[in-house]
Amino acid sequence: MLGKTRYRPIPDIINEISEMETDWVELHADHLTEDRDYALELFKALEPLKIRWAGETTIRIADDPELLEAAARSGAKYLLIGIETPSKAALKRAGKGFVKPENLKSQISNIHAHGIIVDTTAIFGFDEHTPEIFIETAKFYHDIGVDITAPAIAIPFPGSRFYKQLEQEDRLLSDNWGEYDGAHAVYQPKNMSCEELEAGAEEFSQHFYSVSRSASRKLRQIKDFGLATTLQIS
């Protein structure tokens, strides 16, 4: 059990940011808007600082106009959002059934309308995944408007349900913790080989960042964010 989430006093955060010699900061939290009231209070306190910030939250922020607008007013310019996969079955298994692939395009468009860049990781290696998932995900992420992404192979952290499942099924292949980095297949995938999983993650990047898709994405980003911001997007 992770226990209860602890929150820093907002005045402490504001004081620390005020002393920084920068107008761009990362509000580091695994789920910045988990406590909605806290997030609203924080965003209001950030407004006078006139900063730009990056943070991590869930796609639910797209369906909360008050919270999204408050984030934008406070300087939100870049959000890492856990989408992970277009597979509904895999999302449900990961405890993210609230992510509805059919709604993501409009939700991301709503975030873009507030001048906010959307980043998300593409997670591969779910039991529901077959070798077709890599190109499917690249196309899906492009079509729904993801701005930045990188692939990662699912990591079975010790103590997690995923780890226990793989252990029970005798599918763990490595106890070298240095390989538990999202780049190595440390377990036997269900519907492909380890080599296919590792190569597929690279294949995803090649397709998402192909010349044609990158050019199309840049044109859309110029429209959404302007040229200066677009040139800063990797």
Language-model-detected regions and their locations in the chain:
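C-terminal accessory regions of radical SAM enzymes
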Residues: 117, 132-135, 139-147, 158-234
